[in-house]
C-alpha cells in the first residue's frame, strides 16, 4: 500500500514549506525504503494508546494483586516494573508485549517479507511473562538487565521455560552486576 502525506515545515523557523513524502505500508507493517532494499517492520504496541490510563490505574492499586490486574491491560510495549504493597508483598515483572512468534527463525536478523506465516498476531499474556513474586530472598533488583537474574538465584525465572523466539535479553547491565554482588544487608544499608 503506497500513499502520500504532506508535511508542513518551517525552514530556519521562518519560511513555511510543504514537503510531500511517500508512505509505504505492508501486511508486516510500515516499510522503510533504502538504496539497498525495502524493510518492513512490526513491533508490539505500534497501535497501543492506553498507557496513560494504565499509569493512572496502577497508581491507585492498593495491593500487588490489584496492581497485577491493572497490568493485564498490557498497554506498555516494554517496561520492567517492581511493585510492593503495605502487606509486605513484592513483585518484579519483565513487562512487555512479547510477540508469539514462529519457532525456527533468528528473530534478531532480517526475515523474508514474502513469508506471511512470519507475521505474528498475538503477544504473550501478562501472566506468562518472566516475573518474581514474594521471593524467599526477600528482595528484587531491576536495572535494565535480563529478567532471569533479578533476585536470589533459587527464585529467578528459568530461561528454559520461555521460547527462544520470545527474544528475552540475557545480558547484564553494569548496575545489575554491582547490585547482585551486594548481599541483602549491604543493599539495605546502601539505601539508608
Protein language model regions, located:
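Mature extracytoplasmic enzyme cores
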Residues: 1-192
Amino acid at each position: 500500500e503506497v500513499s502520500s502525506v504532506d508535511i508542513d515545515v518551517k525552514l530556519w523557523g521562518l519560511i513555511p514549506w510543504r514537503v510531500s513524502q511517500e508512505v509505504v505500508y505492508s501486511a508486516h507493517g510500515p516499510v522503510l525504503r533504502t538504496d539497498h532494499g525495502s524493510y518492513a517492520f512490526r513491533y508490539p504496541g505500534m497501535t497501543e494508546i492506553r498507557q496513560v490510563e494504565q499509569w493512572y490505574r496502577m497508581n491507585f492499586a492498593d495491593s500487588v494483586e490489584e496492581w497485577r490486574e491493572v497490568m493485564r491491560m498490557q498497554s506498555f510495549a516494554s517496561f520492567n516494573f517492581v511493585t510492593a504493597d503495605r502487606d509486605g508483598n513484592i513483585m518484579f515483572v519483565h513487562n512487555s508485549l512479547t510477540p508469539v512468534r514462529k519457532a525456527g527463525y533468528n528473530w534478531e536478523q532480517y526475515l523474508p517479507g514474502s513469508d506471511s506465516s512470519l507475521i505474528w498476531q498475538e503477544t504473550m499474556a501478562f501472566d506468562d511473562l518472566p516475573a518474581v513474586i514474594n521471593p524467599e530472598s526477600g528482595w528484587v533488583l531491576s536495572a535494565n538487565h535480563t529478567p532471569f537474574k533479578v533476585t536470589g538465584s533459587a527464585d529467578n525465572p528459568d530461561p528454559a521455560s520461555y521460547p527462544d523466539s520470545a527474544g528475552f535479553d540475557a545480558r547484564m547491565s553494569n548496575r545489575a552486576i554491582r547490585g547482585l554482588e551486594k548481599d541483602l544487608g549491604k543493599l539495605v544499608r546502601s539505601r539508608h
